[in-house]
Each structure stands twice: as C-alpha cells, then as structure tokens.
Amino acid sequence: MLPWNVRRSGMLTYSTMTETFQEQFARGYKAFKEGGLADSRAIFIKAVRSAAEEGDRPSLAEALCGLGQAERGIGNLEAARHHYQGAAVLYRQIGPPASLAYTLRHEADILREESLPAEAEPLYLEAEAIYRQQGEEAELDLANTLRGLALVYESTGRADGSRLLFEQARALYAKCNVQAGVAECEEKLSPRK
C-alpha cells in the first residue's frame, strides 16, 4: 500500500509540497514580468494541475488566469482564451466579481486581437458593468475595459460610441496618472489629417 501522500503516479500531492499556491503564483508572475514566458507557463501548468487535484477552485481560477497570461505572452491566443474561459466559469460560481471582470476583459482583449469584435463586445460590457459597481478602486481596470470596448466600436464603424468611450477612458487614465493611456486616448481622439 502506498503512503497517503503519494499518488499512484509516484508524485507527491500538493499538500505535501512546501510551496504554497500564492508563492507559486508569485514565481509565475515574476517569471512573466522578467520575460521568462516558458517558465511562467510551466509554473502555472503545475499550479493548475495541483489546484485541480486539491479541488481548490479559487486557486484553480487564479492559476488558469496566470496560464492564460503566459499563453497570450507566448502568442498562443487560442489556448489563452480557453484558460480565461475556464477561469470565468469558476469566478461566476465563486466570485469575487472583480476577478470575474478581470478575466472577462482579458478574454475580450484576445477576441478583439483575433478580429472577433462581436464576440468581444458582450464580455467588455459585462466587465464594464462590474467595474462600475466597484467604484474608485476599479478605475484603472474600468479605463482599460473602456479602451478595449472603444477599439471594438472603432473596428465596427461606430465612431461616435468609440469617441465617447475613449473620452471616458482618457479621464480615468488621467485620474490614475497613467500617461501612456492618456496619450493613446488623445491620439485616438485627435482629428485625422
């Protein structure tokens, strides 16, 4: 008979490891920020597997988001979208709403990048509604969401709607002191020559 902490595969269960999920996530995000996309991906794959084995749905949702981010960074948009979709399913069940909105926005960003504006728009709108309910603490996230939605409107010929969204995003970026966001919105709002 195998010891209680060893699976038939011979691997230790996650509960016997010394690294917590939060430590693992921190390593994965650090690797991502430092350009180690393959390392980040490997860390989050391990975290997804471990969280699934543990039945830890909050950690699984976060690990799926991290894996989605790594896949997107690598350029594997289809896999990234799949991971964000999985995380969204979990966040719809367990919350919190801000995590759901984050996940929806990133999935929408990918759909927009894949030239699928009709699929991206409802996700942006849902994320926008959640962020507006969150108030001041979510202003930067709301600005990013409005920017993405404005780009969808722009790509589908809705110039007036796009302009209004870029104006709202610019004001929020200014309030959050994100000059790159302000500059992009101002460029989009400037008359074309």
Regions found by a protein language model. Give the residues of each.
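Short coil/turn linkers that connect adjacent helices within long alpha-helical scaffolds
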Residues: 12-15, 34, 52-56, 90-96, ...
